[in-house]
Amino acid sequence: MELWFTEKQTKHFGITARINRTLHTEQTEFQKLDMVETEEFGNMLILDGMVMTTEKDEFVYHEMVAHVPLFTHPNPENVLVVGGGDGGVIREVLKHPSVKKATLVEIDGKVIEYSKKYLPSIAGALDHERVEVKVGDGFLHIAESENEYDVIMVDSTEPVGPAVNLFTKGFYAGISKALKEDGIFVAQTDNPWFTPELITNVVKDVKEIFPITRLYTANIPTYPSGLWTFTIGSKKYDPLEVSEDRFHDIETKYYTKELHKASFALPKFVGDLIK
């Protein structure tokens, strides 16, 4: 008998994947966590019925969250990742030699535990000497920080459950306070097909706080619609004005210096959302 997992991305649309076996399942303090082995995408992390990452396509999301802001900032030394318990963003952050410390604040320690066990190629960097892992509320961590970070990356789930506070104007204001005077932040902001209002609202809120606010995209097969957006807010540096000598060689599968700028070229219907 074949076993299939289906994520209902809207009431009337979803994606499905053939499952070889279930590796782990439990209701944590915060959410339903499932780790499964799929036929097509390798091991897959699912939270509250939503695909968070897979071994096959994880590099797209993690590279685009990390490298766009880190190449935009001329000397990022202290980096904060809110969420991201699978460790993929941290792995990419550590590819930048200027980064002296990377802090991960993940509310659900079980995500970290089982990512290390079943997604070692993604989570392996969490034990690096430059990394500090904190299990706790990222919203509260931001509120308690001031003038501390060069770059903050918000690697959250959808705006439901424990992540709901990470999509508010108050949170973005807190991020601005936690950043240094030339700091940059980036957040995943879902897709323009099914959640256009979210993108419009987030960009509007961020624009009221950060003088440079831009939206960029990436193609991620297992995420709703496949077209994913990220919002970047910067106090000083424009991601579209990065000099050529800023780009140093790192090993990537998706991100390139050409794609860095190209990712900000938006389809018209997406650009219309943020006019």
Swiss-Prot record:
EC numbers on record = 2.5.1.16
One annotated GO molecular function: spermidine synthase activity
Give the binding site residues for spermidine: 62, 86, 155-158
Cellular compartments annotated: Cytoplasm
Identify the pathway. Amine and polyamine biosynthesis; spermidine biosynthesis; spermidine from putrescine: step 1/1
Q: Which organism is it from?
A: Bacillus cytotoxicus (strain DSM 22905 / CIP 110041 / 391-98 / NVH 391-98)
Instruction: Give the gene symbol.
Output: speE
Enumerate the spans annotated as PABS domain. Answer: 2-235
Quote the function comment for this protein: Catalyzes the irreversible transfer of a propylamine group from the amino donor S-adenosylmethioninamine (decarboxy-AdoMet) to putrescine (1,4-diaminobutane) to yield spermidine.
Q: Which family does it belong to?
A: Belongs to the spermidine/spermine synthase family.
Main location as per UniProt: cytoplasm
Q: Give the protein's recorded name.
A: Polyamine aminopropyltransferase
| InterPro entries, per database record | PABS (IPR030374), PABS_CS (IPR030373), SAM-dependent_MTases_sf (IPR029063), Spermi_synthase (IPR001045), Spermidine_synt_N (IPR035246), Spermidine_synt_N_sf (IPR037163)
- Self-association state and partner proteins as the record states: Homodimer or homotetramer.
Which keywords does this chain's UniProt record carry?
Answer: Cytoplasm, Polyamine biosynthesis, Spermidine biosynthesis, Transferase
Cysteine disulfide links:
none
Report the HAMAP family cross-referenced here.
Spermidine_synth
For S-methyl-5'-thioadenosine, which residues are the binding ones? 31, 106, 137-138, 162
Reaction catalyzed = S-adenosyl 3-(methylsulfanyl)propylamine + putrescine = S-methyl-5'-thioadenosine + spermidine + H(+)
